[in-house]
Amino acid sequence: MGRGACVPSAASGAGDRARQLGAVLGALCLFPALVLLAWPGTPANGAGARVAQGDAAPQTSGVLASGSLGPPHPPVPRRRRYTLTPARLRWEHFNLTYKILSFPRNLLSPSETRRGLAAAFRMWSDVSPFSFREVAPEQPSDLRIGFYPVNHTDCLVSPLHHCFDGPTGELAHAFFPPHGGIHFDDSEYWVLGRTRYSWKKGVWLTDLVHVAAHEIGHALGLMHSQHGRALMHLNATLRGWKALSQDELWGLHRLYGCLDRLFVCASWARRGFCDTRRRLMKRLCPSSCDFCYEFPFPTVAATPPPPRTKTKLVPEGRNVTFRCGQKILHKKGKVYWYKDQEPLEFSYPGYLALGEAHLSIIANAINEGTYTCVVRRRQRVLSTYSWRIRVRS
């Protein structure tokens, strides 16, 4: 992909601008399954190999202890995210095409790569109205897949699309609809089979099907799931869950609807049949849809913006950075960021870059809204700042 795939260009035409509006939304990353394989009696407190945490906490680094017989220790599980994107980004059609722009240089042949990706796509097409078809690289497609080195596409010039980090770090990232980009780190050792540590090669062998299925979920509009056994869980590779769970189905159906055979279940649920006609709903409505299920999104205490909110009218495509009072941070306060009262916990490449005391976004119609930073020390609010962003066409 050429430059500008993630960040709108001021010189783009009207058609490109509409496409780039969706392209600016971020990729989510999947990290390696650093499964602990310690021998009996081996201490479990050795330092792990470098694990990049590109969309979460600061990076950790270290080297394997000289006396250790186990591979790198697993990263500490991190906090969970919403299941759907903030703007509920989705595809407007179900017959999606994909093309493979480059293949891995380690271990897998092109034919094996195609077979692994096709298996990952089948995991989603078997439980959804989507169908996926590969097309030639020179043809237009909805999804574009590639195996890339550290410096790929526009990662060096884009503040919101990060580069890869080499082996045993970030495995892949995918962009929300309608961008369609799915990038795999070509420094990894991809295989068809379970993720495992190779003592002979001294590297991790990573299951392509597992990682690809996770990234396809992001490309369809799903974020990380809260369910511990979901394929879309933040640490799915670490935990080893490979099958799609009911949680992914509910997330997918919230975005695209669930096509029940009689096309009546949704209206029955609205009429109260979940309480008054439970047997009827159970007998005629697909259990995978579960129209009576209320998805348990995480909730946080509402944080209204301060009385004085700065309004900024920004040209479309401009990079906007908010800074949350450096002086107040010296009082050992912790910064919390919100958009329209929803918490922002992680950076999303191509969407926003989140630092301790600053937040950067690309101005576009979807990123319009009110951004608030709250500095707290324990339960006490030390300071608040708020900005309202409006895009000038």
Curated annotation (Swiss-Prot):
Function: Protease. May regulate the surface expression of some potassium channels by retaining them in the endoplasmic reticulum.
Protein name: Matrix metalloproteinase-23
Residues annotated as domain ShKT: 258-292
Post-translational modification note: N-glycosylated.
Taxonomic lineage from the root: Eukaryota, Metazoa, Chordata, Craniata, Vertebrata
Name of the coding gene: MMP23
Transmembrane segments: 21-41
Cofactor names: Zn(2+)
Cofactor note as given: Binds 1 zinc ion per subunit.
